[in-house]
Amino acid sequence: FELGFNGEKYELILSPEGLRSRLFPLVYFQQQAPESVLEHWNIWVGRQPSKDFMLRAGDMEIRAEDVQMWAEETEDQQVSLVLCCEKLTPLLKEDTDRVWWALSMLVDQTIGEVSAIAFVAGFDVYAQPKDKPAMLLSQLPELLQSMGLSLWRDGSDYLENSYLAYELEPVEDSEADWRLDVYTGTCRLPVIINDYLTARSDAVDEYHKDGIAV
């Protein structure tokens, strides 16, 4: 979480750390806040976009304008990104994880963390620019808006209005596992279905640890 003050109210920003599944418990927590608290506090789920955000990495200061971006639209109204920041290139050999963290933070601060979850399918980090014309990361909001997408400001609004549709080939064998005969539907958390179909339980296990799922 992050704490701040906007000149009028204190602000508590709860980060889902890039995971849609973590939005649900954070939104629930947000909605339990009493009115007496909300008189003095804004509680946000997801980092908010900040146009003038600057990230300090060691002796370097990095803004979204320092990051080159190549975007490819996916079939489900998302974008896959390739990012290259020459200021971070020397750090790639020493601490790759730190570079990924820095660029993830810049993406979140450019369009907001919830919008990043909703619209960014993923990104790769390149040490050298591609041989194609690049945009700047700071132009990502305009790119998404040109695709007809509206940025999400808060996790609660996103979850309330985002249903994902899916379609599968039904398994007609009467001895097949449960649910494999279901071929189309809508849901808000597709990772649960994916985990079930691949015999995984990562999301449910995380919920169990917090006493959410039974």
Region locations from a protein language model:
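Short loop/turn segments at secondary-structure transitions that flank enzyme active sites
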Residues: R20, P49, K87-T89
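An exposed acidic His-Trp-rich patch
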Residues: F29-T74
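Long, hydrophobic alpha/beta structural blocks
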Residues: R63-L180, P190, N194-D210
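Short beta-strand-to-loop capping motifs
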Residues: L14-G18, C85-K87, V214
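An N-terminal, globular interaction/scaffold subdomain
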Residues: F1-N42, G46
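Short acidic, gly/pro-rich beta-turn/loop elements at beta-sheet edges
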Residues: R22-F24, F53, L91-K93
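Short linear motifs at secondary-structure transitions and domain/linker junctions
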Residues: P16-S21, L55-M60, D157, R188-I193
